[in-house]
Amino acid sequence: MLAAMLLVTMITVIMTFVHASKMLAVKGVAAEAGLLWCESVLGEYDLNLRNRYGLFGFYGVESDISEKIDDYAQRSFADKRYIRYEGSSCELYEYSLASVRNFREQAVKTGKLVAAGVVKKPDCGIRAAVSADTPVDGEAVLQELPSAGMREGMRLPSLKQLGRGEKENPVKKGSDRYFEDRYIQTFFRDFLDEETSPVYFRGEVEYVLAGKKSDKENQRTVKRALMTMRTVLNLAYILKEPEMKAKTAAAAALLAPEAQPAMQKAVETAWAAAEAWNDCQLLQNGKKVPWMKDRKSWATDLESVIRSFSAEKGKSSLKKRTPYVDPGNVDGPDYGGYLAVLLYAMNREVKIMRAMDLIQINMRRCYYGSFRIRNYSCGLDAELKINGSRVHVRKMY
């Protein structure tokens, strides 16, 4: 009797072990197959997103992706009687390209490839869809932008950074922020870039910085920021140079001897602003402007500033028609270099969302009218129901 009970117990244990082993094996097969099916879904990435903007993303809603996985599973398990496939469910929300985190991760990866020289500035345009709704143009493309509701403007580098007289600009190479900006300046053009493909904004980097709805407003906002930045830097140089300080003191004594200290500060600021205006003209004409000036790179003379200052009764006047002075700078950042400083200083979330804006605007304008970046995903979670159990698989680009 005891022997029979032991035999039954052993058989039960063995059968339980066999069943558990079988389930583990089935789950292993299902997990490997599930990863392969997810890989197939990821392989259907949008070519325009990839070729024009260096991003991987596939289009689809959760129900459609589940149907694809079900189809793959039924084909794979059709001749496997020990596997009973009971369907799948998918989760895409976490992987939307409209997520700042997801977009940033891809932008940083691509930015690193740009910095390494592996990826170049794209020379291809956006191809219109063969069978889709008609592309839209005009102000209609500005509707439902990812950055809608964000009002934060451009940030300048801190006055401490600008005023301490560093030879180099404050952009720190090698950080994720730096690689984001490399991505933006590679895949979006600024006002000085040659037109290689039709886009809505001529100055796309300027849009990222300013967020206005017209090129004119964006350019004006960026120029104002450059003027402010260069004025602070130029003033820092004037205050460090004894010869220039002596000139401004003498000019202040002539203009307002009874209030010389206050007038000297006004003259110094006016001189720095006049030099900043000239700096902006140089930058917008493709020239370089050193981050911190020296005697060779300083272009304006105080006499001209004083004449303008006196003519306006104490208010500096920078006439738009005045030709700029080119000191022939060899070193220093160009216009794109200064935009990089402004990009580096601005709010990262706003910056990423405005980059999404540009992609959505241009894709709606050139690809198909109902394009929304939120409908594209960079990965998926899938839950497979196999033999009464659940198997989870996850895959990203």
Question: Where in this protein do the model-derived segments appear?
Answer:
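Alpha-helical assembly-interface signal, strongest on the long, hydrophobic N-terminal helix that forms
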Residues: 1-64
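Long, compositionally biased low-complexity segments
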Residues: 47, 55-397
